[in-house]
A protein has these predicted regions:
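A short SAM/SAH-binding and catalytic strip from SAM-dependent methyltransferases
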Residues: 127-141
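Conserved alpha-helix/loop element of class I SAM-dependent methyltransferases that forms part
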Residues: 40-58
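Conserved SAM-binding motif I beta-strand of class I
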Residues: 83-88
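A short acidic, Gly/Pro-enriched loop at the edge of an enzyme's catalytic core
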Residues: 119-129
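A short glycine-rich, Lys/Arg-flanked "PGG" loop and its adjoining helix->strand segment in the class I
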Residues: 75-79, 142-157
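Core SAM-dependent methyltransferase catalytic element
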Residues: 189, 195-216, 224, 243
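Conserved class I S-adenosyl-L-methionine
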Residues: 57-66, 159-184
């Protein structure tokens, strides 16, 4: 009579894989956790980059860069005359980003270990700030993005991509922000909603620009928005709480 394989033996391949991750370094394990195994299928990174209309020579911040999923795609888009600031508050991830930039020869990528309340971008500013799957992690988002305005150059933009209620796993663990919350918070931080792209199945993809108002003036609610097809709409205004 053949003995049945133990549960331990059945699990050995998984344990070996876990051990490999551990031996390869904590940052690599985090990177795999952030990016998943099939992210390209649902994140559509090439279409995201194309939608942002980045020009050679642009300066771009990848806010919450993580393992560099978008960082080096952005670096290719801005070219040698441009610059990408890979911003993260996790030292493990910034060290990983620095190693990757060196290995890839990406001289147009600067890595920034930021503070939780300030991305610490250069005073010279950027043309675009892209934040992907990071918005829901930021505390005091209105004050955070109000502070970030100083880093945007004239005609600068912020692109926010975050999980929404359609993402089942992320919704279960509240790793998401409803679209209407993002719009309301960004308006309160001093931005107008410029455009929306709807080709991402799990995420909202929203573009904002700073409102131009006189010093000391109160920012008006309900700034004009435009969807991907160019049709105007207005953000919903409602009372809410978000943990």
């Amino acid at each position: 009579m053949k003995s049945q394989p133990s549960k331990f033996h059945a699990c050995r391949p998984k344990l070996a894989l876990l051990a490999l991750f551990i031996l390869s370094g904590c940052a690599t394990l985090k990177q795999c956790a952030y990016e998943g195994l099939s992210r390209d299928e649902w994140q559509k990174p090439d279409r995201v980059i194309q939608s942002l209309q980045i020009r050679p020579g642009n300066y771009v911040a990848d806010l919450g860069a993580g393992g560099g999923y978008f960082t080096f795609r952005l670096a290719a888009a801005v070219g040698s005359a441009g610059k990408v600031y890979a911003v993260d508050i996790d030292p493990d991830m910034t060290q990983l980003l620095e190693r990757q930039a060196k290995q890839k020869g990406a001289g147009n990528v600067d890595v920034i270990l930021a503070k939780p309340d300030d991305p610490l971008l250069p005073a010279s500013g950027v043309d675009l700030i892209l934040t992907v799957n990071t918005y829901h992690h930021i505390s005091s988002r209105v004050s955070y993005f109000a502070n970030v305005r100083k880093y945007l150059r004239p005609n600068g933009r912020i692109a926010v991509i975050d999980f929404d209620r359609r993402a089942w796993i992320e919704g279960l663990f509240r790793h998401y922000t409803p679209r209407e919350f993002i719009i309301r918070e960004m308006e309160n931080a001093g931005y107008s909603f410029q455009r929306e792209f709807d080709f991402l199945d799990r995420q909202s993809f929203l573009i904002f620009a700073p409102l131009k108002v006189a010093a000391g003036a109160r920012l008006p609610p309900g700034a004009l928005q435009r969807r991907e097809d160019g049709s105007p709409t207005r953000a919903p205004h409602r009372s809410y709480e978000m943990s």
